[in-house]
Structure formats: structure tokens, C-alpha cells
Swiss-Prot record:
The lineage of its organism: Eukaryota, Metazoa, Ecdysozoa, Arthropoda, Chelicerata. InterPro entries: Scorpion_toxin-like_sf (IPR036574). Residues 1-23 form the signal peptide. Keywords: Disulfide bond, Secreted, Signal. This is Neurotoxin BmKX-A1-S31. Expressed by the venom gland.
Length: 55
């Protein structure tokens, strides 16, 4: 059971790392540039979506 939990934690950490490096796997809606802070610094809101998070 400990091995299963350890593998699960590793998978979660890697998925968070990939999300951080490549943006969110889904389009992030926004109204202002402040809504895009989770996508990284300096990311702008264009056409209602954070540009870096919609690759």
C-alpha cells in the first residue's frame, strides 16, 4: 500500500510539473490580465482567454 501511495504522489507531482511548464490542459477564461497570474508572470488576457494556457 505504501508503494502504491508513493507512485500516486510521484504521478501527481509530475502532472503538476508538466502543467506548470506547458500551461493548463484546458483554456483558462479571463477578463483582465490579473486573472492569468496562475499561467505565469506577464501573461496577457486576449479574447477572453489567457494566451499561455491555451497551447
Amino acid at each position: 500500500m505504501k508503494i502504491f501511495f508513493a507512485v500516486l504522489v510521484i504521478l501527481v507531482l509530475f502532472s503538476m510539473l508538466i502543467w506548470t511548464a506547458y500551461g493548463a490542459p484546458y483554456p483558462v477564461n479571463c477578463k483582465t490580465d490579473r486573472d492569468c497570474v496562475m499561467c505565469g508572470l506577464g501573461i496577457s488576457c486576449k479574447n477572453g482567454y489567457c494566451q499561455s494556457c491555451t497551447r
